[in-house]
Amino acid sequence: MTEASRIVAPERHADDVGDTALRPQKLSEFIGQRQARANLQIFIDAARKREEALDHVLFVGPPGLGKTTLAQIVARELGVGFRATSGPVIAKAGDLAALLTNLEERDVLFIDEIHRLSPAVEEVLYPAMEDFQLDLIIGEGPAARSVKIELAKFTLVGATTRAGLLTNPLRDRFGIPVRLNFYTEDELEKIVSRGARVLNVGMTPDGANEIARRARGTPRIAGRLLRRVRDFAEAADAAAIDRAVADHALGALEVDAAGLDAMDRRYLTTIALSYGGGPVGVETMAAALSEPRDAIEDIIEPYLIQCGYLQRTPRGRLLTSHAFRHLGLTEPSRDPAQSGLFGQDEDR
């Protein structure tokens, strides 16, 4: 199983091409992240008045919350050029040098997954961010020489889902750190309604709410669900997407009222029925579901923990009362000693 095989995956899908049309073009159109938006607007306005490059910006947050969209909006609001790449694509220092030397004054360079830059590339990036210079070594051995190249004053916008993997020297060079949070149901409802208008699809308030509450707090998922529900509505010749149409479509897509899909429910049900609600080790769950451990930890569990359905304890995974209620199952009585609060399980 991969993230790309799940409609509720926050990572970008190959078929998310329609997502571009739904993206806001200005900060005033961007819904959610109120404080982050307000601060960015102030920093952008100040940089424009001074006719200076904006300080380097770091967007931190889970996938699908709008980091790339905000980076594009920043460049648009500043009225400057925008270049985009990602950490894994910049394989060597020469690749980064080619990008930086082609930037115009005050341009924005966006690096997605910036935590995946190699150490060698990072070393070249430090003086570029701080002094707007490139320090390159030309040649090899005794003939090698150091060359300094002056760069246009640019703005680096980095995005990461794993802030803990950033090195301290890189993190400290960003003057404007911005953390993005999951969206509220009301915010997602507005995003879905706006998306429906952009797609020229009829949408009732309760239809937008039905999609929003299953979108896992993530605009990218909301947009993807909207496009799929639109397909069902058009196939059924529905005049508009109301709650009944949305509920039918999302039910057919196996996305339940809490935004859980078939894999989420299979995971929870296996712990509930086969292991008495836990605790059970992650290696045991990987074997029971025929999934690699990484898929369990990185793809399935994060949202279940966020929703309060699952606890990671020293002895393994443990379902909460909330999970049993959602599954419609009776929670077994458990001895506190079995709750996973004590002891250590080698495959936790």
Swiss-Prot record:
UniProt binding sites for ATP: 22-23, 64, 67-69, 130-132, 173, 183, 220
UniProt keyword annotation of Repressor present: no
Region listing for Small ATPAse domain (RuvB-S), in residue ranges: 184-254
Enzyme class: hydrolase
Residues the entry annotates as binding DNA: 293, 312, 317
Region annotated Large ATPase domain (RuvB-L), chain positions: 1-183
Keyword Amino-acid biosynthesis tagged: no
Entry binding sites for Mg(2+): 68
EC number of the protein: 3.6.4.-
GO CC term, one of those recorded: cytoplasm
HAMAP family, per the entry: DNA_HJ_migration_RuvB
Name assigned to this protein: Holliday junction branch migration complex subunit RuvB
Natural source organism: Nitrobacter winogradskyi (strain ATCC 25391 / DSM 10237 / CIP 104748 / NCIMB 11846 / Nb-255)
